[in-house]
């Protein structure tokens, strides 16, 4: 019994001791957990403060940027406002000048009317005095010479007539000179009005385009293995592809603006695509040609909309767009035609003509230049023929002939076009004679080659020192290609004057294509 009691007591003591130990451990763990929780809370608090500080910094930066943008925009708007105020002030000044000119013209007109009235009254008085003098003279003659009244009257009339003719001739010359001076003054005023109210842009056409590339490694890919790619490019595009030490640039040279523009776009697409090979070059070339045909029509439509001209045949609209890729004496044909259209409208309006009809004749006066690369004949004859075919207004056709002196100007609108054409062409720096003679020589060289039978195309390259002729392999064999080169060279030598020598390069390529099915 005692042992049982002792055992129970020992057990209770063990339990109590265990409880105390466990409690102590729990207290220790609680302290640790509490410290950890406090540390985490401090870390979270620190992180929150850091985020708050970052947010405040960003807010301040955003406020600063917004304030800066606002100030810049305000400054820009203020400048624009000041500029518009200056423009308005200039226009007001111009209007005041116009009003002053009109007032002076009105005063001069009133003065002229008063002078005419005075002269008329003086003429009446002179007539009365003349009648009185005539009667008196007749009486004297009858008394002195014993003449009859009719004989005396005829003698006096002859003398008066002779004297009157001399006086009339003097008066006519005087008023003719005054009329010429007034007409010249009026013409100068109209031309000054036209040129001041139209400020056109001008940029001389170049003979090269530059294609920018990302790195010079692409130059090797464009040249291709054994030069295959560059040969295909030059043959298909009809331009001179120049790859030299110029960093990140490929130069395209050709006198033909249309070919050069297409070539530029083709090479840009090839570089962007990365697949540069002969078949891909031809595919991209066809795609770009189709795009350009569509863009030419759109260009023509936009120009006519800007000018306020309607009811123009689509073929003529397309030719207007094509003028963008033609040049005359270094002056872009479309820019020249637009300038002539605007000036013609202003001159016609000032002289009492139809402004819209003058603009129509102005934009179409050089339309034949869009066809000179494809058909034989002068741009005047080609332009008149195409306008007659599509039933354009007779004034337009007259302007096409008259601006080169082939016909007389038969209307105010036509005369306005002739004057505007002379203004645009004669402006200093507008045209370059040497460049035009070079372009004409190159075109003649190409036309000689194309005129031969079995030739698909001909492209002058290397500044006109070489012509590359593409022969149809089905119509021309190798021996005939040699003869063609000789014939073309001889004809160029006989018909064209040029410095140095011209290389004639006839290319005949046969492609056999079959599909495995």
Swiss-Prot record:
Question: What is a single cellular component term in the Gene Ontology annotation?
Answer: plasma membrane
Key word Cell inner membrane present: no
Transmembrane helix as UniProt keyword: yes
Occurrences of domain HD (ranges): 333-426
- Quote the subcellular location field of this record: Cell membrane
Q: Which InterPro entries match?
A: HD/PDEase_dom (IPR003607), HD_domain (IPR006674), HDIG_dom (IPR006675), KH_dom_type_1_sf (IPR036612), Ribonuclease_Y (IPR017705), RNase_Y_N (IPR022711)
GO biological process assignments = mRNA catabolic process
Tell me, in one coarse class, where this protein mainly resides. membrane
EC annotation from Swiss-Prot or TrEMBL: 3.1.-.-
Membrane protein topology class? Single-pass membrane protein
List GO molecular-function terms, semicolon-separated.
Answer: RNA binding; RNA endonuclease activity
Q: Which UniProt keywords apply?
A: Cell membrane, Endonuclease, Hydrolase, Membrane, Nuclease, RNA-binding, Transmembrane, Transmembrane helix
TM regions (residue ranges): 1-21
Q: Which family does it belong to?
A: Belongs to the RNase Y family.
Q: What does this chain do? A: Endoribonuclease that initiates mRNA decay.
- HAMAP family attached to this UniProt entry: RNase_Y
- Protein name per Swiss-Prot or TrEMBL: Ribonuclease Y
């Amino acid at each position: 019994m005692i042992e049982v009691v002792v055992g129970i007591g020992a057990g209770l003591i063990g339990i109590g001791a265990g409880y105390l130990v466990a409690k102590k451990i729990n207290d220790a763990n609680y302290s640790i957990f509490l410290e950890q929780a406090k540390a985490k809370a401090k870390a979270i608090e620190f992180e929150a403060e850091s985020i708050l500080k970052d947010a405040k910094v960003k807010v301040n930066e955003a406020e600063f940027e917004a304030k800066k943008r606002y100030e810049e925009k305000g400054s820009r708007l203020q400048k624009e406002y000041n500029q518009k105020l200056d423009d308005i002030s200039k226009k007001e000044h111009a209007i005041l000048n116009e009003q002053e000119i009109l007032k002076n013209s009105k005063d001069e007109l009133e003065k002229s009317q008063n002078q005419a009235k005075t002269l008329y009254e003086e003429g009446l008085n002179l007539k009365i005095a003349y009648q009185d003098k005539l009667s008196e003279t007749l009486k004297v003659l009858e008394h002195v010479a014993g003449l009859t009244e009719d004989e005396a009257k005829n003698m006096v009339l002859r003398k008066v007539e002779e004297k009157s003719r001399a006086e009339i001739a003097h008066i006519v010359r005087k008023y003719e000179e005054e009329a010429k001076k007034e007409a010249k003054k009026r013409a100068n005023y109209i031309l000054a009005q036209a040129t001041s109210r139209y400020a056109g842009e001008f940029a001389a056409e170049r003979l090269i385009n530059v294609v920018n590339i990302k790195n010079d490694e692409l130059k090797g890919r464009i040249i291709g293995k054994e030069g295959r790619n560059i040969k295909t490019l030059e043959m298909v595009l009809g331009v001179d592809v120049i790859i030299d030490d110029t960093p990140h640039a490929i130069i395209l040279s050709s006198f033909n603006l249309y070919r050069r523009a297409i070539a530029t776009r083709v090479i840009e697409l090839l570089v962007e695509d990365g697949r540069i090979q002969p078949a891909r070059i031809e595919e991209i070339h066809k795609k770009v040609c189709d795009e350009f045909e569509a863009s030419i029509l759109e260009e023509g439509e936009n120009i006519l909309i800007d000018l306020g001209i309607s009811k123009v045949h689509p073929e003529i609209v397309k030719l207007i767009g094509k003028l963008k890729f033609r040049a005359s004496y270094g002056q872009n044909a479309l820019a020249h035609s637009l300038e002539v259209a605007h000036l013609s409208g202003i001159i016609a309006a000032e002289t009492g003509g139809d402004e819209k009809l003058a603009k129509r004749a102005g934009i179409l006066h050089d339309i034949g230049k869009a066809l000179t690369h494809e058909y034989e004949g002068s741009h005047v004859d080609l332009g008149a023929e195409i306008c007659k075919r599509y039933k354009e207004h007779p004034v337009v056709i007259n302007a096409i002939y008259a601006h080169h002196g082939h016909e007389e100007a038969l209307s105010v609108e036509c005369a306005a076009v002739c004057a505007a054409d002379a203004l645009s062409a004669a402006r200093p720096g507008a045209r370059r004679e040497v460049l035009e003679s070079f372009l004409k020589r190159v075109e003649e060289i190409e036309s000689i080659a194309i005129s031969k039978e079995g030739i698909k195309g001909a492209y002058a390259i290397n500044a006109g020192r070489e012509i590359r002729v593409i022969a149809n392999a089905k119509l021309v064999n190798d021996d005939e290609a040699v003869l063609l080169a000789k014939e073309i060279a001889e004809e160029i030598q006989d018909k064209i004057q040029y410095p140095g020598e011209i290389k004639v390069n006839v290319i005949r390529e046969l492609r056999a294509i079959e599909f495995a099915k």
